[in-house]
A protein has these predicted regions:
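Accessory alpha/beta interaction modules
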Residues: 1-160, 170-172, 220, 228, ...
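Short hydrophobic beta-strand segments that form the core of ligand-binding sensory/regulatory domains
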Residues: 163
């Protein structure tokens, strides 16, 4: 690889890294490798500054031999044996109520061992951190729990679902956390804990610990972009069943690969929802 090529790659990688926020799920998983960051986020959402975690697992696979398995963004347990599933959701489809229900159900299945009584189920929280107000209630946070309709009293099954709407920013602790989730620059962040971790990752040299983590992250972004491009192209090609449509989708696949190689992650995201922008990129690359 020529020197100019190496230099260009470094510049492109730095552009990607600079554009990342906590709402980028892959970046968030790297940030949460520091358990103190997970604790701070939970403390703020739960309104409990004393909350401490015993353990956490990122990209935790919850298998289901008889149905749909899940890979959880973050699964953790506090000192009182309460369990939390934290999910970063940028798309409405990823934060549907029935998805939250399924997460809670599969967590219960994995935390109740054979022979144990149901009373031994831990208190559980499924927390969706969303980019938009997916429940359309114009609220910053939503707490969902079962109630007895006839009396209006709580049904104490200790299963909780929380939606944290990060599009709502104000001067409250939750509002400041929401602002931090969308900040590209550490100087814009309110939390010292989060900003310190983000700065370490974004400013680290390639041979340093944070730099190595970011190299893995960028490779995962490349693989994800290629996979999404291929799946999208194949799906559309099969649906249409026409040769010209198939050829067009092959061009989209090729485009996604080129964009990934050039580190243009924002263009991949935008082209997936903007058809005119997709066409302009195809022209740019002569496809």
């Amino acid at each position: 690889m020529s020197k100019s090529k190496v230099e260009n790659d470094i510049v492109e990688k730095q552009k990607i890294i600079s554009s990342l926020t906590l709402m980028d799920d892959l970046f968030m998983k790297v940030v949460l490798q520091d358990k103190e960051c997970t604790e701070y986020i939970l403390q703020t959402i739960m309104g409990d500054s004393t909350l401490k975690l015993k353990r956490q697992s990122l990209q935790k696979n919850l298998s289901n031999l008889h149905g749909h398995s899940l890979v959880l963004d973050c699964l953790c347990e506090d000192g009182n044996n309460n369990i939390y599933n934290i999910e970063i959701q940028n798309n409405i489809s990823g934060a549907e109520p029935k998805r939250a229900r399924y997460h809670a159900g599969l967590m219960d299945m994995h935390y109740l061992n054979k022979g144990n009584h149901f009373s031994q189920l831990p208190k559980s929280y499924v927390i969706f951190i969303t980019a938009n107000d997916v429940l359309h209630g114009k609220l910053q946070i939503y707490h969902i729990e079962r109630t007895i309709q006839e009396s209006g009293k709580p049904f104490w099954d200790e299963s909780h679902i929380i939606y944290f709407n990060t599009s709502y920013v104000d001067n409250s602790p939750l509002g400041k956390l929401a602002e931090d989730f969308h900040a590209k620059e550490t100087e814009q962040m309110n939390s010292d804990i989060l900003s310190k971790r983000v700065a370490l990752l974004k400013n680290a040299k390639p041979n340093e610990k944070g730099g190595k983590e970011m190299n893995v992250l960028l490779e995962n972004y490349r693989k994800k972009a290629l996979k999404e491009g291929i799946e999208k192209g194949i799906e559309k090609g099969i649906e249409k069943g026409r040769e010209e449509e198939y050829i067009a989708k092959q061009k989209v696949i090729q485009l996604m690969g080129l964009l990934a190689e050039h580190g243009r992650i924002d263009d991949i995201k935008k082209s997936s929802i903007d058809q005119e922008y997709l066409q302009s990129l195809l022209l740019e690359f002569g496809l």
